[in-house]
Amino acid sequence: MEKLNPYFGQFGGMFVPQILVPALKQLEAEFVRAQTDPEFLAELSELLTEYAGRPTPLTLCRNLTKGKKTKLYLKREDLLHGGAHKTNQVLGQALLAKRMGKKEIIAETGAGQHGVAAALACALLGLKCRVYMGAVDCERQKPNVFRMRLMGAEVIPVHSGSSTLKDACNEALRDWAGSYDTAHYLLGTVAGPHPFPTIVREFQKIIGEEAKQQVLKKEGVLPDKVIACVGGGSNAIGIFNDFIDDPSVELIGVEPGGRGIETGKHGCPITYGSKGIFFGMHSLMMQDKHGQVKESYSISAGLDFPSVGPQHAHLAETGRAQYVYATDDEALDAFHELSLKEGIIPALESAHALAHALKLIKHDDKEQIIIVNLSGRGDKDIFTVAEIFEERGIL
């Protein structure tokens, strides 16, 4: 069998309890087989088109850049069924689980978008679903908790640690260690032990493939910059992948700057982290001087993660992609501006990427084409944002 490379430069690997190694190897073997199986590829393609609603549009912002030289496009993953890019790879992994004879799906979720995607895929394909979600995230993402339960998923609040995404990941892995005979762990991002970072990327790369074709059709040239928010990093790798070999295209990942780097309340493992082992992989992460993983923080639950996928760590180290950050306040401003001027309410996660694009346009407006991956819609965030805007007298 052809094997996948478990490393991206020095990052990646499979640092898990021995008990999980056979399950990961089974997953790798099944994925490699599926990639050359016309039946699997046809079924996935049909689901992405007829059920999820691909291709998603590439929308030109008509008002945000009025009077500017820059053309700003949004890759509209917010229009995908389920409300975010998560659906792309969940359908792929759920089909793999069925091929392996698994009857149950275990998932972790932060903002609830991956949990919703897992729940909808399980409802569609007749699989049982249980989703681990930090208790703090359950509170700040109530609409998504209800959506998951409505579609038949069991949502399990996690009260350990900071009760956020990192803790949900740990609980999901723990569950899988005792149930891998019947269950598949449907990991939601390009992080974790091999082969997950590669599998998730391969199912998400359709975003960049479409975006490249669409921008070439509209403009006749490649974009100057492609920008995406980075938590674990799946939406960013999804849109970056097809442009990696195009050196003229700048790839920019935007981490959550939280309340400001100086406060320590942020989620920037690439820009302010160091190398270590966490969640089954060697990558960059936020650690204290004793090597303990520090708590991350972001207003957006989906970016509230103290590490990042190994391919992003590699892209940062080689300089192929640049990583910056946007604070909570900058993301909130972008959230408001896009809603007000274009009639599109973005997820708070995606608003981080938009915030950086708007900053670039403000300080360096020139003849350029920028694509922002609008990874999800903001319905899930309206209660959080409404509370803040009310306090600040914005609305």
Swiss-Prot record:
- Which co-factor is required? pyridoxal 5'-phosphate
Q: Does the keyword Amino-acid biosynthesis apply?
A: yes
Q: Which GO terms describe its molecular function?
A: tryptophan synthase activity
What InterPro entries has UniProt attached to this entry?
Answer: Trp_synth_b_CS, Trp_synth_beta, Trp_synth_beta/beta-like, TrpB-like_PALP, TrpB-like_PALP_sf
Q: Which reaction does it catalyse?
A: (1S,2R)-1-C-(indol-3-yl)glycerol 3-phosphate + L-serine = D-glyceraldehyde 3-phosphate + L-tryptophan + H2O
What class does this enzyme belong to in the EC scheme?
A: lyase
Q: What PROSITE patterns does the entry give?
A: TRP_SYNTHASE_BETA (PS00168)
Keywords on record = Amino-acid biosynthesis, Aromatic amino acid biosynthesis, Lyase, Pyridoxal phosphate, Tryptophan biosynthesis
GO annotation, cellular component aspect: cytoplasm
The cross-references to Pfam families, in alphabetical order and at most eight, read: PALP (PF00291)
Write down which residues bear the modification named N6-(pyridoxal phosphate)lysine: K86
Similarity annotation: Belongs to the TrpB family.
Protein name, per record: Tryptophan synthase beta chain
What's the source species for this entry? Psychromonas ingrahamii (strain DSM 17664 / CCUG 51855 / 37)
